[in-house]
Design a protein with these regions (language model features):
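A short helix-to-beta-strand connector/capping loop
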Residues: 145, 168-172, 206, 227, ...
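Short N-terminal helix/helix-N-cap motif within the alpha/beta-hydrolase-1
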Residues: 132, 158, 184, 241-245
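Hydrophobic packing residues within well-ordered alpha-helices of enzyme cores
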Residues: 137, 160, 188, 243-247, ...
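Hydrophobic pocket-lining residues within nucleotide cofactor-binding pockets
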Residues: 128, 152, 179-181, 236, ...
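S-adenosyl-L-methionine
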Residues: 2-153, 158-219, 222-225, ...
Length: 302
């Protein structure tokens, strides 16, 4: 499917199930056809001007059938020649709509144009989620390059591995770590969706405690030389400064390197930029969002 223009998510879901397991495709086929039969009637029965959305119908059906955390759809993206599978679950409301779908629209499109690894590069993706950057990077760097996709959240990590396998990628290594400024334990907070994770302390929310380490240590443990890294992408929902603090060896020793970082919140902008300046990085691309976040790509000055 093309992601260059807005799509109706209900129509998209009604037509996209290619690549899913036979069981999931059969379940989706049945739910889809039941919806097509009863959807128009819902307006009459419930006395509504608009019928219930297919997304809501799908979530409710999955809940009733007891398929939470086990039902997958696959989105085919011929424009970029890769696929993404997505977990559809009532326990993570609107994961498919708010995160995966939104990420495949123009919000990320112009950023990816400037995120440009070349053949043979080594890319480190911190906060890889389901592979939105890691999978295209795999094709950009080719068989002589490598991509290390680091994801802290266990559920995201499982979807990431599934997507790497779905696209038959052999140059992507998936790592289940939380990246931080020191070796410690951190809480991954999940707020409404599986993608909305924040590494912060002092908030009383539902959270998963996971082991964390510095990016320098993680790469060393996986036999990745700091000097070899060409691209780092960071999207960690507010912990980007802590990630950079734990990457001293990489930032000091890698000469041919660029960093793409999504800075969450206006208060985090200056500290992140100041740290990049300290290591002699120059901003080559910046995009500011209305909600206060910024996307920055910076390259090391030789």
């Amino acid at each position: 499917m093309s992601i260059s223009s807005p799509l109706n998510i209900d129509n998209l879901l009604l037509n996209e199930a290619k690549g899913a397991s036979v069981k999931d495709r059969l379940v989706f086929f049945c739910i889809k056809n039941i919806y097509r039969s009863v959807g128009p009637l819902s307006m009459i029965i419930l006395r509504r001007r608009r019928r219930i959305s297919f997304m809501g119908f799908l979530y409710k059906s999955i809940e009733i059938l007891g398929l939470d955390n086990s039902f997958f759809l696959v989105f085919n993206m011929p424009k970029y020649d890769y696929k993404f599978c997505s977990l559809v679950t009532r326990k993570i409301p609107n994961f498919l709509v708010q995160d995966m779908y939104a990420s495949m629209t123009s919000h990320e499109e112009d950023v990816r144009k400037h995120f440009s690894p070349k053949k043979g590069d080594i890319v480190v993706d911190v906060g890889a989620a389901f592979g939105l950057y890691a999978i295209p990077s795999s094709k950009q760097v080719g068989q002589n390059g490598k991509v290390f996709a680091i994801e802290a959240h266990p559920d995201n990590y499982e979807v990431l591995k599934r997507n790497v396998k779905l696209n038959n990628l052999t140059n992507v290594t998936c790592l289940n770590y939380a990246v931080y400024s020191t070796k410690t334990k951190v809480k991954i907070y999940t707020n409404y969706t599986i993608m909305s994770e924040r590494v912060i302390s002092g908030e009383e929310e539902k959270a998963k405690e996971v082991n964390a380490d510095t990016l320098d240590n993680i790469l060393e443990q996986n036999k990745i030389s700091a000097e070899q890294v060409n691209w780092i992408k960071i999207d960690v929902e507010g912990a980007e400064l802590e990630v950079l603090k734990g990457a001293h060896n990489i930032l000091s020793n890698s000469k041919d390197i660029a960093i793409s970082v999504e800075i969450h919140g206006k208060n985090n902008y200056e500290p992140v930029i100041d740290l990049l300046n300290l290591y002699n990085f120059k901003i080559i691309f910046q995009k500011n969002y209305d909600w206060g976040d910024s996307q920055v790509i910076a390259r090391h000055l030789i």
